[in-house]
Structure formats: structure tokens, C-alpha cells
């Protein structure tokens, strides 16, 4: 069923992490690579019906920069990379889609490339020509840039990671759920967390 304008649906799934790791490792993939590939595979099979497409399926994936730059900051410290699959032939297996996703992510998730992305982002913030521009104009410009970048990607998948809590709180918590706000042009999104 189609939802009314201005509303969105949320679907939650829960699975044992140990079993997911076993399946992902069976494909020689990390959990992130596996989830992104499953999402791309689903779009390829269900929306494109396994046919070649003119546009790539592009998934925005946030990358935590802390391990690459030895940082303990509690602020958001990440950049976005885009895992890309471009269906050009009649039929792909899941393994072929996964290999494309892994290649795409591996080519971008390395210290040199992440440093370039981070430096570009910081240079925009420190641009002396932008300092006298009123904040409301900067906010409008940022909204336009954000919307254009969101439309450039089919969807976004983020992995919050393993959520740890103090032992004294564990009896009161059954699990965690998370979701990402909707973006123009991205009507499906995924959030992963483990507990």
C-alpha cells in the first residue's frame, strides 16, 4: 500500500549477529559489505527486474574516520562514500553484485582517499570568502547541496555499530532500533545496529 504524502513507514528486523557474521564471512565479506550488497541485489532484482539499467545503483555509506586518524572525538567524524553497481548485462548473480560492491568500497575506503574527502570538507568550512556571507544564505546553499547529493545516490545505509551499555541497565533494555530521516529522491534507507 502507498503511504499518504508526508508519511513514511519503518520496518524493523532482528537477527542474531553471530549468524549474520557467519553468512557474511561465508562470502568473504564484512557485515557492511554484505548488507550493502543485499540491499543493492534487492533493488536490482525487484525494481530493475534483473535487467541492465541506464543508471547505476549507488548507495551512500558513511565511514567513521576515527580509526583512520587516531581520534577519540565524540563529535560526528565521518565522510560519505558511494558503493556503486552498474548493471550492464542481462543477469548477475549475488556473488557478482557483492564483488562489485566490495571493489567499489575498497577503492574508496583507504586513508589517502578518506583524507582527500575530509580535507575537501574542511576547506569548504574555512573558506575566507564565505565568512561574510549571512548564515541564512549558507543554510539555503547547504540544503541545496545536500538535496543534490542525496539525489545522486539511490539510498543510504548506515551501520551504527555495536551499542554497549553498562551492566546495571541491561535488565531494562530489550534492544535498540534506529532509522535515518528521509531525503528527497531516497525512498528506501537502511540503518544497522547491534546489541
What are these regions (language model features)?
Residues 1-9:
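Short amphipathic alpha-helices and their capping loops
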Residues 28-29:
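A short glycine-centered flexible hinge/capping loop motif at secondary-structure junctions
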